[in-house]
Regions:
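Helix-turn-helix/homeodomain-like alpha-helical modules used for DNA recognition
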Residues: 1-30, 37
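Short coil/turn segments at beta-strand junctions that form active-site/ligand-binding loops
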Residues: 9-11, 33, 102-103, 173
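Structural beta-sheet core signal
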Residues: 15, 37-39, 70, 177
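Beta-hairpin (beta-strand-turn-beta-strand) motif
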Residues: 18, 40-42, 73
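Short, surface-exposed basic-aromatic patches at helix termini and helix-loop junctions that form
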Residues: 29-31, 192-193
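Catalytic or ion-translocation cores adjacent to nucleophile or general acid/base/metal-coordination motifs
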Residues: 34-44
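Conserved phosphate- and dinucleotide-binding cores of soluble alpha/beta proteins
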Residues: 44-219
C-alpha cells in the first residue's frame, strides 16, 4: 500500500540485499510504467544467492513489470585500489551514476553479529569481525557497518565495498529501511541517527523497543 502511494512512472528504485526486500514482490502493484530497479551493492552470493541484490532486482523488476540493471562485481573487494580500478568500467560507472538519481531506495537493516547477512556473506574474516566489535559497530546497510551514532568511518573496511555510499541515501526522496524484531532496535536507531533512512517499515515489537531505547538514551 505505501509503495503504491509513492511510486511514479519512470522512477529509479535502488534495491539492497535480503529476503525481506525480495518479499515486496508479493505485494507489487502493476500499474506503473518504466520502473527501473538497480542494485545498491555488488554480489553477495556466498551467503545465499536469493539474498543477493542482483537477484532481488530480478525478482522485483519481474513483479513490477519493470527493467532491472545489474552490478556484476563482488560486494567487497580485498583492496581499495581494486575498487578504484573497477569503478573505471563503463557498466559499473553507469550504475554508480544512477545512484544520484534514485527516487526510492529499499534497504534492509542488519545487526553487527553472526546472524546478519553481512557477517554470513563470507566477505568478513574473523579479524574484521573482531575489529567491528572493537569499533562498537551496531548495524549495517548494504554491507556498510555503522556505530550507534550512524558513523561509518568507524570501520575502515567500508571503503572496500562496491556499491552505494550511504551518504547518497540521505538525498533520496524515499529511503525506506525495512527491519523487524526487537534485536534490530539499536541498528535501526543508528541508521536513523546517520540519516540513511527517512521511512521505516517495522513491526510493533521493534517499534516499542525503539521507543524504550530512545527513552533510556535521552534520560
Amino acid at each position: 500500500g505505501y509503495l503504491k502511494s509513492i511510486l511514479r512512472d519512470n522512477d529509479i528504485i535502488g534495491v539492497g540485499m535480503g529476503t525481506t526486500i525480495r518479499y515486496i514482490a508479493t505485494y507489487a502493484p502493476r500499474q506503473f510504467q518504466n520502473l527501473t530497479f538497480i542494485p545498491l551493492l555488488g554480489g553477495t552470493g556466498n551467503v545465499d544467492y536469493t539474498l543477493d541484490a542482483n537477484h532481488v532486482v530480478d525478482h522485483l523488476s519481474k513483479a513490477f513489470c519493470g527493467e532491472g540493471q545489474h552490478l556484476y562485481v563482488p560486494a567487497v573487494v580485498s583492496h581499495v585500489q581494486t575498487k578504484r580500478t573497477l569503478m573505471k568500467e563503463d557498466s559499473i560507472r553507469q550504475i554508480m551514476n544512477a545512484y544520484y538519481h534514485l527516487n526510492v531506495a529499499l534497504v534492509g537493516i542488519g545487526t553487527a553479529d553472526n546472524t546478519s547477512s553481512a557477517f554470513r556473506s563470507g566477505y568478513y574474516s574473523d579479524e574484521m569481525k573482531q575489529q567491528a566489535v572493537r569499533d562498537r559497530v551496531c548495524g549495517d546497510i548494504c554491507m556498510h557497518l555503522f556505530d550507534k551514532e550512524g558513523r561509518t568511518d568507524c570501520f575502515p573496511y567500508n571503503k572496500q565495498i562496491v556499491g552505494v555510499n550511504l551518504n547518497k541515501l540521505k538525498k533520496v526522496p524515499y529511503a525506506i529501511g525495512i527491519a523487524s524484531g526487537v534485536r534490530k532496535a539499536e541498528a535501526i536507531r543508528g541508521a536513523i541517527k546517520g540519516g540513511y533512512i527517512n521511512v521505516l517499515v517495522t513491526d510493533a515489537q521493534c517499534g516499542e523497543a525503539l521507543t524504550r531505547l530512545n527513552d533510556e538514551l535521552n534520560n
